[in-house]
Amino acid sequence: MIPSKEEALEELRIAEEMNPGPWAKHSLNVGIAARNIAEKIEGMDADKAFIFGVLHDIGRRVGIVDIPTHVYAGYEYCMQKGWDEVARICMTHSYLLMKDEFTYDPETEHEKRIKEYVSSIEADDYDKLIQLCDALAVDYGFVILEKRLLM
């Protein structure tokens, strides 16, 4: 289950009030990029892609935290809301190589749970789309991948 576009935008607004920062505009731009790309791909739902993009970083609502903490906080929040598909995106968006990201033994409980989760699934088209759009989008718009990945 996923929220409506309106619910997703309201969740982002609330989260930005809780933890102001450029991440919220970045998230909106991820949603816009995901929607625009999904519109051109047969079988993809552009509205779903937009919602996934808008909410991929919703775990940042808890404050300025490291990647595993915001990933897991987003997953937990979305699961509590009953948004299992969005929760999946929260877990997968920061791990482009999925299980191969973990060339080390995770130390924190968050990292252990993330590793277990991403190791148990294969990235689908929405996971890959949000990973791509996460790299393209910044708070002020979009950049070429080379610039974003080298920043």
Explain the meaning of each model-derived region.
Residues 1-3:
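Non-catalytic interface/linker regions that flank or bridge core catalytic/transmembrane domains
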Residues 6, 33, 37:
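Active-site hotspot residues in diverse enzymes, especially metal/ion-binding acidic/histidine motifs
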Residues 13-16, 41-150:
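Divalent metal-dependent catalytic cores for phosphoryl transfer on phosphate-bearing substrates
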Residues 21, 36, 60-62:
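Short, contiguous strand/loop micro-motifs
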